[in-house]
Amino acid sequence: MKFLLAFSLLIPSVVFASSSKFQQVEQDVKAIEVSLSARIGVSVLDTQNGEYWDYNGNQRFPLTSTFKTIACAKLLYDAEQGKVNPNSTVEIKKADLVTYSPVIEKQVGQAITLDDACFATMTTSDNTAANIILSAVGGPKGVTDFLRQIGDKETRLDRIEPDLNEGKLGDLRDTTTPKAIASTLNKFLFGSALSEMNQKKLESWMVNNQVTGNLLRSVLPAGWNIADRSGAGGFGARSITAVVWSEHQAPIIVSIYLAQTQASMEERNDAIVKIGHSIFDVYTSQSR
């Protein structure tokens, strides 16, 4: 993590990568699109030199649970502004429980701090915890306004869990683009959107994610580190946003989004693994 923090003040101008460098990645993504009859978007941003590559980077995809990083970043930002106390507590009511809440469902009748709610939703993808955070930061509109404030004109949140995961084709609600989300993560972790202390906290939540072991983490090169957040939704939506780095490799921000496919969850997970492996090959082959 020390290596990651060393780049916390660096946001280089974007430089488009040569098409030849990512030629194999593009071929692999296209092949997966065909095999799954899916729509796929990918972006890769090297934070050291600003080198950027994408595939369908400006197309819209359902945010699904990748929004949780943004919601928790908003909580951290609001705490810096004195608008909210992350140590304040919220009573957990049975009526507030929504589907997939592995942490919160065991704490009905108890109180949870906003900080702990972020830890729960970032590390287990607990949906009720996410709604608790949304309530504290002004709801979906508060999140979207925050995104506009930091310069993200594309990403938008319109609903809460679980409705935001609907994923209908052509529905602009609760969507992002691979390019926009990569830029926003760059601002959260390496820019001035958050203090260094809160950059470290957000990174720690992503590093400690417990539900992505079968995705990019399964093909992470030896000696590399990862901080990530995944998501899934209707109409074949599956996604992951991640930062990967090593002692010799500056942080790389990767976003992968799948949509409009009838592929099984296992097939969609495998698609993310294959795309991630192809991306990692670009960087590991350079150091051989």
From Swiss-Prot:
The keyword Signal applies. It comes from the Bacteria. Coiled coil: none annotated. Pfam families: Beta-lactamase2. It catalyses: a beta-lactam + H2O = a substituted beta-amino acid. Disulfide bonds join 72-118. GO terms for molecular function: beta-lactamase activity. Residues 1-17 form the signal peptide. Belongs to the class-A beta-lactamase family. The active site is at 65 (acyl-ester intermediate). Its EC number is 3.5.2.6. One of its GO terms (biological process) is response to antibiotic. Hydrolyzes both carbenicillin and oxacillin. InterPro entries: Beta-lactam/transpept-like, Beta-lactam_cat, Beta-lactam_class-A, Beta-lactam_class-A_AS. This is Beta-lactamase PSE-4. It comes from Pseudomonas aeruginosa. Gene3D superfamilies: DD-peptidase/beta-lactamase superfamily (3.40.710.10). Keywords: Antibiotic resistance, Disulfide bond, Hydrolase, Signal, Transposable element. The keyword Thylakoid does not apply.
